[in-house]
Amino acid sequence: MMKLCVVLAASILSSMASAQTATAVAYSPDQLLQLAQQMREQAKNSKEAGTGILEKHLDSATILAFRDRDGKAELHQQFGDVFVVLQGTATLVTGGTIASPTTTAPGEIRGASIEQGIRKKLQEGDIAHISAGVPHQLILDAGGTFTYFVVKIPLK
């Protein structure tokens, strides 16, 4: 079974290098949580979350993310995000101003935190939509983890 999961994960994550396609894809929460186990290892060896692009579509992309620490404050000028919480709890901070902002790529800004933002607790089953241009940051509960599915939606 483990070998099958590894092969499945490798085939899904290999889509990171593939061209955008017109397709329909469905995942069960169990499938995503199995893949997230590999993200745990990636997160342990990184300063950021463990993430993997699941699919690149003509009009969007899907990402699976596992966090074992707070995220940086971020803002995407050309993409909106939809988060679907699979496991764990975190506080989503939105709006406000990014402290010490740095442009990390065209249209991508990161910073240490958000000042004057609105805080919303997220838990399993919650869905959050963050429009392009809105600062946002995930803050984890002490010692907690957070697994979520992301849909990246480009501005048109």
Describe the residue ranges of each PLM region.
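Short hydrophobic/aromatic-rich beta-strand segments that constitute the beta-sheet cores
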Residues: 64, 92-94, 148
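A short hydrophobic beta-strand segment most commonly corresponding to one strand
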Residues: 143-156
